[in-house]
Amino acid sequence: MNEEITVEELREMPQGEYLLIDVRDSAAFALGHIDSAVNVVPGQLGEAQLPMDKPVVVCCRSGIISDEIAAQLREDGYQAANLAGGYVRWLGQKIALQSSADRAAEIERSITKKFHRSIFSKFAKAINEYELLKPGDKVAVCISGGKDSMLMAKLFQELQRHRKFPFELVFLVMDPGYSSENRAIIEANARLMGIPITVFETDIFNSVYNVQNNPCYLCARMRRGHLYNKAKELGCNKIALGHHFDDVIETILMSMVYGGQVETMMPKLHSAHFPGMQLIRPMYLIREDEIKHWARYNDLSFIQCACRFTDTCTTCNPDGAARSKRQEIKQLIAKLNEGNPQVVMNIFRSVENIKLNKIISYKTPDGEIHSFLDGYND
C-alpha cells in the first residue's frame, strides 16, 4: 500500500476493505468527520486493536500529524497510509460536489419548517426580547465559517424576508490568514447556502503565531477590532456574532471557576473603542445541540477552528484531554447535566435573578465596591 493516498483514491476504495481512523480530538470529530471513520486519539492507538490484515488509513485535520502516525504504524507492521490533506481536503471536495441552487432552498425550508421552533423562534425571541434590531440598522453579520455563524447568516436572511421594519445586512468574512483550503471551504459553503459574503484580509495569524501566553485571547481581541473597523467602513452600526446559549452558560461558569467573579456574556454591548457601534448576539437563546442537529439534518460540514495552530494539529492532545478551559467547562456541564437536566437552564436563570441583598459585595460599572455591611446596622 502507498504511504499516502488522496481523497479521490479514498472515495474509490470499497468500505469494509480498509479501516479509517481519525486522530483528531473527540470535540473536533463530533463536529464533523468522514463517513465510516473511527475516532482514535494518538494516546489510545496502543489499545485500539488495529487490523493487521487490511489497510489502515490515518486522517487528521490537515494531514500533518497523521503522516507521522502512519509512518510509525508502518514500522510496527501495519499497512498504514496517510490521507493527504486530511479532513479539510475531504470536506472541500464534499462541498464542491453538492448542487448549490437546490441545496440552498432545502436549507432555507428546514429553518422555516423542521427547526422553526427550536432555532428560528428562539432567534426571533432574542431579537425582540433584548431589542437587538432597530429600524434603519445596518448589521455586519460576522462569519467565521463555522456552523454557528453560517446558521446565523441564514437566520438573518429569513428574518429580513419577514421584516417588520427596514434594516440592511452585510455578510462579513475576515480572512486573518487562513490556509487556501480553509478559505476555499468557507467560500464554497457560502455559495452552497446562498450567502453573498464580503471578504477582507488581515495578517492576525502572523501577528499572534509566536505569542506564548494565551494567543487565542489576543487573536479574538484583534479579530473583533478588525471586524468593528471594517463594519464601520461599510456603513454598519452593529456587528453580529454567533455565540449561542451554551457559550453563555460556559462563560458564566468560567468567570466563576477561573476568574473569581460573576460575569456573563451579554446579548448586546456598546463598543468601547468604536463610538456609535454595537455588538449583538442574536443566537443567545439557541442550544448548540440544535445547531448541530440542523447541520447534520442538512448534511452540512463546516470548519471548526481554522487558525494556524489547528492547521498544523499542534493543539491535538495525545490523550484526548481537554485542550482549553472552555472545553473543561463543557465537560463539567455535561457531567452535571447527567444528574440534573435542568442544571443548564438554572445556571442561565441565576444571572437573571441576582438578589443584591444576598451578595457579600458587588461592583458598579464605574468600579465602586458595595459591601453587605454598608448600612447593615441602620
Regions found by a protein language model. Name each.
Residues 39, 82, 171, 199-201, ...:
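A structural preference for short, hydrophobic beta-strand core positions in alpha/beta folds
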